Amino acid sequence: MLVDGCLACSVLTGKVQAPGGVIYEDNYWVVEHSLSPVLLPGYLIIKLKRHCENLAELTLEEASTLGSIIQNTCLALSQVVKPAKIHVCSWGEQVKHIHFHVIPRSSAMPVGNLKLLIYLQIKKLLNQLGLGKWVSDAETAEISQKLKQHLKMTI
């Protein structure tokens, strides 16, 4: 079941498209790049293919495949983007549909969860003011394609 007005559901139905398209999907989960405008190359979103807002409501099958999806996504990101660290998190406040942010932190970015979140918010604000640069859809699509190829070989 998908829900009207849910951003994640809109992406799943194709009403909104992530640059580079679907990187990986199985019966329960989809991996795509974050939506435009793109803040960081390789900033991925893993989302459940049905609308669900509570991890406790995952089916046994959905829950049992999540770990391998996260691990394989991080492995591909490690080899393609080569970040210093990969952060995986889920807030579910603005977009309640279960999804996980997979954030590659380069060595030039601050270490620490709170510092990283503040850095990303400042970077976004500077980009919105025209004082920074968004990642182009072409670069995002190229990274997505490399990640897709890597995941095809490993899963």
Where are these regions (language model features)?
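HIT superfamily nucleotide-processing domains
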Residues: 1-155
